[in-house]
Amino acid sequence: MYSEIQRERADIGGLMARPEYREWNPELIKPKKLLNPVKASRSHQELHRELLMNHRRGLGVDSKPELQRVLEHRRRNQLIKKKKEELEAKRLQCPFEQELLRRQQRLNQLEKPPEKEEDHAPEFIKVRENLRRIATLTSEERVL
C-alpha cells in the first residue's frame, strides 16, 4: 500500500511544474533564475578571480592587513634611509674628527661603569652612606 503511494508521487513529477503546464496556464508565475552575487558584482568577480589565481599558485592570503604591511614597509624604508645617512656622515668626517669621536666614546665608557656599580649596590649601603653624610654635616655645623 505504501509503495503504491510512492509510485503515484513519482509519477506526478515532484513539486516542479512541467514546462507544458506553464505554457498551458498563462496565469501561473514563471520562475526566474536567481542571480549569483559573485557574477552580479564586478568587484566580487575581480576578488573571486584573484583568490582563485592565488590558490592555484599556492599563495596563501596574507594574515596581515594592508595597513600593517604599509606601515612595516615605511619603517623598513626609514631604517634604510637612516643607515645611509649615518654612512654618509661617517664618510664626510675627516680622520681628525673620527679620532676625536673615538676618544670621546672611550672616555664615556670609562665613566659609565662606576655609575653602574653604584646602582647595583644594596639599598642599606646607600642609606648608610646618606646617614654618614648627614652626620658629618651636623658635626661640622656644631663646630662652627
Swiss-Prot record:
GO biological process, one term: actin filament polymerization
Short sequence motif Nuclear localization signal: positions: 74-84
Coiled coil start-end: 67-94
Keywords: Actin-binding, Cell cycle, Cell junction, Cell membrane, Cell projection, Coiled coil, Cytoplasm, Cytoskeleton, Growth regulation, Membrane, Nucleus, Stress response, Synapse
Predominant subcellular localization, coarse grouping: nucleus
GO molecular function terms listed in the Swiss-Prot or TrEMBL record: actin binding
Compartments, record wording: Nucleus; Cytoplasm, Cytoskeleton, Stress fiber; Cell junction, Focal adhesion; Cell projection, Ruffle membrane
GO cellular component entries: cytoplasm; focal adhesion; neuron projection; nucleus; ruffle membrane; stress fiber; synapse
Domain of life: Eukaryota
Function noted in UniProt: Stress-inducible actin-binding protein that plays a role in synaptic and cognitive functions by modulating actin filamentous (F-actin) dynamics. Mediates polymerization of globular actin to F-actin. Also binds to, stabilizes and bundles F-actin. Involved in synaptic function by regulating neurite outgrowth in an actin-dependent manner and for the acquisition of hippocampus-dependent cognitive function, such as learning and long-term memory.
Record note on quaternary structure: Interacts with ACTB. Interacts with COMMD1; this interaction stabilizes COMMD1 in the nucleus. Interacts with MAP1A. Interacts with PRDX1. Interacts with F-actin.
Record family assignment: Belongs to the FAM107 family.
The name this protein goes by in its record: Actin-associated protein FAM107A
Source organism of the structure: Pongo abelii
